[in-house]
Amino acid sequence: FVSFFSNNNLQFYSFMSLQSVVACRSVKDFSDPVLDLIERTYTESFPEVERRDFSLVRNLVRDESRFIVYALSKEDRYVGFITGWLFDGYTYVEHFAIDPAARNGGIGAEAMKQFLVFCGTPVVLEVEMPTDEMSKRRIGFYERLGFKLDNQVYHQPPYREGGEWLEMRLMTYGDVDLEYSFEQVKNCLHKNVYGVKDGLTR
């Protein structure tokens, strides 16, 4: 494979295997045209209660240095995206989706496997409760990549004012022991990702 990666800047890197090539480009300009493609995938892949308005995503690209967006492509064709946050000691993956037109080809697993290799930090993400076949499959997808499901009760704050808190679960990759750091990680996500004021977390 060929790659360029800086853990501080997360600028650009390409993931290669014998079967596929997935390129990941860091999006730094809130007016970058690829954000139009990402917006489409974002709104198609996640229900409204699990995402913010995309205009706010663009604002984060412009204003928040800890917020990261990657456009995924294969053979110069857009196939999906990853968004996340850089925190002390770990990276939080907020949203990860493959465009519907590019699914079922192993691109998602390939991209995430290589992202984990090059990320250089432990990773935390949220998943829906395993209450149906789709949510169970999603958890299984991450478990096959080496993630561990934490069974402590976690609530995702609402993205929109007046919305409901959603019971979810956290999954971790690498050296993140939620048995000891659950409250710290939860409070960090609630405060920085969702804007929950101190003392109002669940």
Regions found by a protein language model. Give the residues of each.
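Short amphipathic alpha-helix that is part of the acyltransferase structural core
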Residues: 17-56, 168, 180-200
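Active-site rim helix/loop that mediates acceptor-substrate recognition in acyltransferases
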Residues: 46-74
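Conserved beta-strand in the GNAT
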Residues: 71, 77-85, 90-97
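Conserved acetyl-CoA-binding loop-helix of GNAT-fold acetyltransferases
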Residues: 98, 104-117
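Conserved GNAT acetyl-CoA-binding A-motif
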Residues: 119-131
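Conserved active-site alpha-helix within GNAT-family acetyltransferase domains
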Residues: 129-152
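A contiguous, mid-protein "functional segment" used to position or interact
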Residues: 149-182
